[in-house]
Amino acid sequence: DYILIMAKGIFVVEVKGGRISRGKDGLWRYRDKYNVVHTRSEGPFDQAQSGKYALKNALIKEFGDQEMKNVSIGWGCIFPDTVNIPQSEEVSKETIIDAKDCDTPEKLLKAINKAMDYWFNKKYYYKEIDSEKIRKMHMGLRPVFEITPSISVRVNEIFNQLVCLTDRQYHI
C-alpha cells in the first residue's frame, strides 16, 4: 500500500482495515466497510513481504546491486481498526502496528520508527541513506510524468463547448 523512505531505510507497509480472518482452509478473508467479504490466499504479512522483494528488485534494477546492498528494506502491516493481533512464529511483533499505535500521529510515527529499527538492526552493514540518495530513490520510484485526456474525452469536451456556444448564439 505504501512505501516510506527514511534515513534508516525503506519500509513497505500493507494497511488492512476492517474485519480480518484466516480460516482453517488457510484462506484470508477481509470484510470491507460495505460488509463485502474478499477472499485471498495471500495474507497481509505475505503481501507486505512480497511487496518488499518486488521493490528491492526494482531498486536494484534502477540503481544497481552495489548501490542497494547497504540499504535496509523492511516491511510491516498496519491494522488501524484492530488491537491485539494474534502473534505467530512467522511474523515478528515489531512488524505489526495496530489501532492503539494509530491513536495519534506521534504514536504512529513512533511505531513506524520502532519497526524500521527492527529491520535496520538486523544486519551490521546497513548504513543510513543520505538525503540525496533518498531524493534519487523517490524520483526513481515516482518519476515525473504528465497524463493527457484521451481523444474521446477531448472530443466530448469540444462538442459540449460547441453546444454551449450555439445556445448562446441562439439567444443573441
Q: Can you say where each PLM-predicted feature lies in the sequence?
A:
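Surface-exposed interaction regions that form or flank ligand-binding interfaces
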Residues: 5-11, 19-21, 25, 33-171
